[in-house]
Amino acid sequence: MFIFLFGLAAFFLCLSAEFQKAKALLRAQVFLKGKDLKWDGESCYLPENRAFGLGIAALVCVSVAQIVGNVVICRGFTKTDKTRTTIFCIILLLFSWVNFAVAVTLISVGASMNREQIYGKGWLNRECYLVKDGVFAASGFLSVTTMAAILGAFAFKVKPSLQVENHDKRHTQNV
């Protein structure tokens, strides 16, 4: 339940960041006027945006959920016998780590672009950068798929042990 709540929080924080990110009007690669962007002819300025804090919060939530989920599942690997589902669990865990890595990269870059970009310094190479539409939404989707993979691995890991316990109970009652 804890993992699910943190994953859900990361998803909604990413969606909120998508709607709060810095924006500018762009036509034919020329900035006409910006809601947030200020241009002095040779350098630009972007104030810090709420998407920065939302992105950091989403990053913390998805990281905590990933780490706690993997600790719970990996602890279960050492306590139980190896079964057929172990391979499937490992595949789900690897899938969750790949999704986690991509989600963390997108959230980190998106959040850092929404931090203050000062005149003459910018975000990278003295230029201001804006997060493209859909970056935070995609990272939210990846956060959800990461949590789904973790919960799936957990469900497949718990299910065989429950079946063994139920089988043992039925066997002792019949004797």
From Swiss-Prot:
Provide the protein's localization: Cell membrane
Q: What Pfam families does the entry give?
A: DUF1218
Regions of this protein lying in the Extracellular compartment:
74-86, 157-175
Q: Which UniProt keywords apply?
A: Cell membrane, Lignin biosynthesis, Membrane, Signal, Transmembrane, Transmembrane helix
Reported phenotype of the disruption mutant: No visible phenotype. Double mutants lacking both MWL1 and MWL2 exhibit smaller rosettes with a decrease in rosette fresh weight and stem height associated with a reduction in total lignin content and an increase in syringyl/guaiacyl (S/G) monomer ratio.
Recorded topology in the membrane: Multi-pass membrane protein
**Which residues point to the Cytoplasmic side?**
25-52, 108-135
The record's section on InterPro entries has: DEAL/Modifying_wall_lignin1/2, DESIGUAL
Give the transmembrane ranges: 53-73, 87-107, 136-156
Q: What is its main location?
A: membrane
| GO terms (BP aspect) | lignin biosynthetic process; lignin metabolic process
Cellular component aspect of the GO annotation: membrane; plasma membrane
N-terminal signal peptide: 1-24
Q: How does it assemble?
A: Interacts with CRK19.
State the family it belongs to. Answer: Belongs to the DESIGUAL family.
PANTHER family cross-referenced by the UniProt entry: OS07G0462200 PROTEIN-RELATED
Task: Describe the function of this protein.
Answer: Together with MWL2, contributes to secondary cell wall biology, specifically lignin biosynthesis.
Name the UniProt record assigns to this protein = Protein MODIFYING WALL LIGNIN-1
Organism (species): Arabidopsis thaliana
